Amino acid sequence: MNLNKMLSNQFDSVVLNVKKTSELVDCSGASVFIIHNNNIVTEEYWGRHSQANNARSIQEDTQFHVASVRKSYIGYAVAYAVQQGLISTDDPITKYLSINSPILQKTTIRHLLTHTHGLKMVNGKLQQEFTSGESWAYRGIGIELLTQIVKITTGQSVAEIVDQVFKSLEFKETGWYGELNEKLVEVIRKPGDPNWYTSKSTDGDKMNMYVSTRELAKWGYFHLKEGLINGKQIVPSEIFKLVTSIQSPNTINEEHPTNGFLWFVQDLPTRRSEIGEYLPKGSFQILGYTGVTLLIVPQHNLVAVRAFNSFGSPEGFNYLADVRKFGDTIMTCLLS
């Protein structure tokens, strides 16, 4: 993927916003990258891969742990399965999973994609905190079930499906890693954090995904352009129409966020949304527990990424207000 670099000062206040956040969270390095009107207009890196004095500097090929931003790749794999006619969003998940549990009978793939399934794991047992389609809750079990459905129905792992795209886009700084290497940042976190885990799996079903800032931005650009890159339609545009359009059931309360295929999609601003209120309808975003954020604003032909090597938030830090400010600052720059 070839993009011209035309750096400008239009988004300097966004860089300042990300630098301020990097000072508030427990990180040793960060970056920001913006594509606007098909040009790279902002690209900045600062800090080091870890807190060690001799740590590698954050740079173009530095790969950040993206945490839940990995769900954008899982969402793509599910959309691929839908586009291939292998599954439907309103299929009950029991059609594909041999889990003998009465609470799953009315849970659909749509519910998993939009965090409206109501499922959770408690002491290793599957429970349901609300009837599928009636509320919204961010739980990891939905992602596990989606990756299983992808593997069962396509015969491929999430990683195998998206690797086909990575090859077409010539991505070399995106992947799931069972072993660390010098280009991967150290993830700074509290000792014993229960939300942190590592994995040897490289199937795309676990949290061990690392991506460079520039390739994450280009992944967003791939979505913005609905797969049409350098005059070539890499994959069917229908995949992106599925991924980035609102899929949430209309039975949930208006205070809850609206989702596409795991992406947060802007409709009306809601109390629990991670998208800033200034962002127009149709904008879509995904945020990781490391603070890594990928935002696409189709109305303004813009993709923005921020990345940090922290994990979780310090006490008193309002991560939702912070990520909304990131998006709202971008809009202020666009409209000023």
Swiss-Prot record:
The keyword Cytoplasm does not apply. Keywords: Plasmid. This is Uncharacterized protein BpOF4_21049. The lineage of its organism: Bacteria, Bacillati, Bacillota, Bacilli, Bacillales. It comes from Alkalihalophilus pseudofirmus (strain ATCC BAA-2126 / JCM 17055 / OF4) (Bacillus pseudofirmus). It comes from the Bacteria. PANTHER family: BETA-LACTAMASE-RELATED, BETA-LACTAMASE-RELATED DOMAIN-CONTAINING PROTEIN. The keyword tRNA-binding does not apply. Signal peptide: none annotated.
